[in-house]
Amino acid sequence: MAIDAATVRKVARLARIATPEDRLEPLAQELNGIMTWIEQLAQVDTDGVEPLTSVVHAGLPLREDVVTMGGDADLITANAPKSTGGFFVVPKVVE
């Protein structure tokens, strides 16, 4: 999959990332390099290799699940830029 400046522009717009026009082509080249690397990884034979979730074999301490009444919605949303009725209000990002 080749990534061009138009694709970078579209992805940047969807991600709400301001990207100057003079950076689109270098970013496209960089993303194409990343995609090439991913394609190389996809060609690696991993048959018989056990999947890992971590390279460190250490367990996490478990705690008892306890039902609580939850937090105070006003306290939780106090630092939010915008909230309504105890819910966070965020801008629509999917078109």
UniProtKB/Swiss-Prot annotation:
* Position of the signal peptide: none
Q: What is its EC number?
A: 6.3.5.-
* Reactions this protein catalyses: L-glutamyl-tRNA(Gln) + L-glutamine + ATP + H2O = L-glutaminyl-tRNA(Gln) + L-glutamate + ADP + phosphate + H(+); L-aspartyl-tRNA(Asn) + L-glutamine + ATP + H2O = L-asparaginyl-tRNA(Asn) + L-glutamate + ADP + phosphate + 2 H(+)
Q: Whose protein is this, by species?
A: Caulobacter sp. (strain K31)
Q: Which gene encodes it?
A: gatC
The UniProt subunit note reads as follows: Heterotrimer of A, B and C subunits.
**SUPFAM superfamilies linked to this entry:** Glu-tRNAGln amidotransferase C subunit
One of the GO BP terms on file: regulation of translational fidelity
Q: Which GO terms describe its molecular function?
A: asparaginyl-tRNA synthase (glutamine-hydrolyzing) activity; ATP binding; glutaminyl-tRNA synthase (glutamine-hydrolyzing) activity
Family the entry assigns: Belongs to the GatC family.
What is the protein's name according to its record? Aspartyl/glutamyl-tRNA(Asn/Gln) amidotransferase subunit C
Q: Which HAMAP family match?
A: GatC (MF_00122)
Cited NCBIfam families: gatC (TIGR00135)
**Pfam families listed in its UniProt record:** GatC
Disulfide bonds, which pairs?
Answer: none
Q: Which UniProt keywords apply?
A: ATP-binding, Ligase, Nucleotide-binding, Protein biosynthesis
UniProt keyword annotation of Repeat present:
no
Function of the protein? Allows the formation of correctly charged Asn-tRNA(Asn) or Gln-tRNA(Gln) through the transamidation of misacylated Asp-tRNA(Asn) or Glu-tRNA(Gln) in organisms which lack either or both of asparaginyl-tRNA or glutaminyl-tRNA synthetases. The reaction takes place in the presence of glutamine and ATP through an activated phospho-Asp-tRNA(Asn) or phospho-Glu-tRNA(Gln).
